[in-house]
Swiss-Prot record:
GO molecular function list: ATP binding; UDP-N-acetylmuramate-L-alanine ligase activity
Name of the protein this chain belongs to: UDP-N-acetylmuramate--L-alanine ligase
InterPro entries on file: Mur-like_cat_sf (IPR036565), Mur_ligase_C (IPR004101), Mur_ligase_C_dom_sf (IPR036615), Mur_ligase_cen (IPR013221), Mur_ligase_N (IPR000713), MurCDEF_pg_biosynth (IPR050061), UDP-N-AcMur_Ala_ligase_MurC (IPR005758)
UniProt keyword GTP-binding, yes or no: no
EC numbers for this chain: 6.3.2.8
Top-level taxon: Bacteria
Function noted in UniProt: Cell wall formation.
Sites where the protein binds ATP: G118, T119, H120, G121, K122, T123, T124
UniProt cross-references to NCBIfam families, sorted A to Z: murC
Amino acid sequence: MSFDFIKDKNKHIHFIGIGGISMSGLAEILLYNNFSISGSDMNSSPITEKLKDKGAKIYIGHKKENVKDADLIVYTAAIASDNPEIIEAKEKNIKLMDRADFLGNLMKGYKYNIAISGTHGKTTTTSMLSHVALKANVDPTILVGGNLDIINGNVRVGESDFFITEACEYKSSFLKFFPYIGVILNIDADHLDYYKDLDDIKNAFSKFIKLIPKDGYLVAYGEDKNIQSIIKEANCNVITYGINSGDIQAHNIEYDEKACGNFDVFKDNQKLFSVKLNVPGKHNILNSLASICIGLASDMKDKDIIEGIESFFGTHRRFELKGCKNNITVIDDYAHHPTEISATLDAAKKYPHNKMFCVFQPHTYSRTLTLFDDFTKCFDNADEIILADIYAAREKDTGIINSNMLGDKLRERGLKCTNFHKFDDIKNYLIENAKDGDLILTIGAGDIYKVGEMYINL
């Protein structure tokens, strides 16, 4: 690991938006290496409390006074240019670096950077691969976009040349990385508040491919038509995977009573080994194939790959079993894009239940608006849909789109759908209507998980 780009280990580094999952991970890596760290966020959280316990100075709220001792400021793409800490940094000539730049510079200190990109599945695949790498004893540094039990959080600092991280395409952040193994799980229309259209997104992924050195590897889902159209841009080793085609394939797929896949792994029409997943759905078969490809490209042993895959039981907020109440199961999932919702509901359909209640909180006004038609078609596997208000995240309500409009379209299509403004009202509705053997599935990238927790903790 090298921090040459920081120049001086005595420097004080301040993070604006330190409570974010990636920012907190970077801060934790620096704390581990004895840097002086501070950070600000709008709200206190378990993440900020954990960083405080590790020695970081945490400020709640953004104020210019927060940066007075900083030598370097790291900020997220969600931070606006009129943020008082950004303004103060510019006035005081304090060096500014966005999160992606900082992470990219950090990656320069490693030889085997594994950057996992794609519209969907990054956190799960990064987590699954982390299990494989730890079983293989490669002692990786890991930065993942979720909490992973095996590393007791979202970051692990290793001593080897292996660095495993997610590579998010939002605002082309991943183009600042230095992948030795670049992974593309899928390409779909998303972040249309930044990208013009799907072609613009594909162009960004095409540039990502070109970052991989000639002796490196592109691992890609070969059955994704959007990936197929850009894979020719690769000037490196290419490994494709899929169900029906690709260098690495899953054959003889069977699902157990919890919708988890068991299958044989084939390479060039020769069976390598069999795997039994402990996470549900076809999408996780594909995620596991990506992890297997990376393991094989990294010369990891088959037994370590198998043990790593089979020891993975999921990450927090990814088809996470929250508990049972009166024989009613509550599961939470981070899905917030129509494709992800469809995959989650498809997995849930195979899960044992009588009636499925899907409690969905749309995430951001821009995504709800630009993908509105797709949102009206992704809930068909749910028996009943409950919609919360849109979670604004980094955006402001312009009055153009709201959750009731989505509910109206779903009802027009003949789906049973009810809108609520308050989580308490959703909880009370579930108390009255969910029966023995039913499944409650909370879905969304905001705070909709709280509904499931409220229900469980009655």
